[in-house]
A protein has these predicted regions:
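Aromatic- and glycine-rich beta-strand/loop motifs that create alpha-glucan
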Residues: 2-38
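Secretory targeting signals
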Residues: 8-10, 45-95, 120-191, 231-236, ...
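Membrane-interacting alpha-helical segments
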Residues: 14, 18, 22-29, 165, ...
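Membrane-helix interface segments
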Residues: 32-34, 115-117, 121, 162-163, ...
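Hydrophobic core positions of alpha-helical segments in small-molecule transporters
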Residues: 37-40, 121-122, 134, 198-201
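Transmembrane helix segments
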Residues: 47-58, 192-234
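Helix-loop-helix units of permease transmembrane domains in multi-pass membrane transporters
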Residues: 95-129, 277
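Junction motif at the cytosolic side of a transmembrane helix
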Residues: 187, 256-279
Length: 279
C-alpha cells in the first residue's frame, strides 16, 4: 500500500497559511464594514462620473493630459492614500484580529495544531489582499473615469504616452500601502484591547507628515508611498522638505518594514493569552 506523503516544514506552513487566508478572506467580503469601505473607496469614482453627467465648460477646456495627471495626483495623495487605503486596511485587519477576541472566537485558532505565527500570517494575507483588491479597483476606475475626458486621445495617452505607466505606479503604491498598514494594524490588534485609539494616533502622525523633520519622516509609511507617485502634489509653505528615497529603496523598505512588523505580531501572538472574563 502506498503511503501518502505528509507535508512538513515549509511546505506544511505554507499550506496552513493559505488555508487560514482562504477562510479569513471570506470574512473580509461580508458584514456591514464592507458597505462603508466600499462607499468610501467609490466616492471619488462617483464624483468623477458626475462630471461627465453634468459637464462644465471650464473642465472641458482644462482637460489636457498634463492637467488631468496633476488633478489625479492631488486626489490620490489627499484622499485615496491618506483616507481610502488607511481606513480600508484598518477596518479589515482589526475585524480579523481584535474583533474575534471580542466575539470569543479567537481561541479556536490559538488551540489549533498550527503555529500562532502561521495564523497571524494567514489573517494578514487575507486582510491585505482584500484591502488591495478593493482599493486597487477604486484606483483603476477613478483613473479611467477621469482620463475619459481626453476622448479619443485617451488611447494614445495610455498606450503611447505615460498613462499606463502612471496607472501602474498608483496601483503599486496602493498595494504596498495596504501591505504596510495591514501589518501595522495586525500588530495593534494583538497589542491592545482597543486598537482604534492607536489607529487614531497613527492617522494623526501620517496627517502631519509634511511638518515632520526629515529624520522622523523615515518612520512614516506615507513617506515611502509618496516617493512612488508619478506626480507629487505641491506642499504648502509650512512644509519641511525632505529628499524622497528612490523607488527601489521605497519598495524594499516597505517590504522590509512589513516583514519586521509581522514578525513582532507573530512574537506577540505566541505570548498571547485569551481571558474572556476581562474582555
Amino acid at each position: 500500500m502506498t503511503e501518502l506523503a505528509v507535508p512538513s516544514g515549509w511546505a506544511l506552513w505554507r499550506r496552513q497559511t493559505l488555508a487560514v487566508a482562504r477562510l479569513e478572506l471570506r470574512k473580509c467580503f461580508r458584514g456591514r464594514r464592507l458597505i462603508g469601505i466600499t462607499l468610501l473607496n467609490l466616492a471619488p469614482v462617483v464624483v468623477l462620473a458626475l462630471t461627465h453627467v453634468f459637464p462644465e465648460r471650464e473642465l472641458a477646456l482644462y482637460a489636457t493630459a498634463t492637467n488631468l495627471s496633476q488633478m489625479y495626483a492631488v486626489m490620490f495623495a489627499t484622499f485615496m492614500l491618506r483616507a481610502g487605503i488607511f481606513f480600508t486596511a484598518a477596518a479589515l485587519t482589526i475585524q480579523l484580529f481584535r474583533s474575534e477576541a471580542l466575539e470569543k472566537t479567537l481561541h479556536y485558532y490559538l488551540l489549533a495544531p498550527a503555529r500562532r505565527g502561521i495564523v497571524v500570517a494567514g489573517k494578514f494575507l487575507a486582510a491585505a489582499g482584500a484591502s488591495a483588491a478593493i482599493c486597487c479597483t477604486a484606483v483603476l476606475l477613478s483613473y479611467l473615469v477621469l482620463f475619459a475626458w481626453l476622448g479619443d486621445a485617451m488611447g494614445r495617452f495610455m498606450l503611447e504616452g505615460p498613462g499606463l505607466g502612471h496607472l501602474l505606479g498608483y496601483l503599486g503604491a496602493t498595494a504596498l500601502g495596504c501591505l504596510g498598514y495591514a501589518a501595522v494594524f495586525a500588530l495593534f490588534g494583538l497589542l491592545w484591547r482597543n486598537p482604534i485609539v492607536s489607529g487614531a494616533l497613527l492617522f494623526g502622525w501620517e496627517s502631519i507628515l509634511f511638518l515632520l523633520p526629515p529624520g522622523l519622516k523615515l518612520v512614516s509609511v506615507l513617506f515611502y508611498l509618496e516617493a512612488l507617485l508619478p506626480y507629487r502634489p505641491q506642499v504648502g509653505p509650512l512644509a519641511i522638505l525632505a529628499e524622497p528615497p528612490p523607488a527601489v529603496t521605497s519598495v524594499l523598505g516597505m517590504l522590509a518594514f512589513t516583514a519586521i512588523v509581522l514578525a513582532l505580531a507573530g512574537w506577540r501572538a505566541r505570548r498571547m493569552e485569551i481571558s474572556y472574563s476581562t474582555d
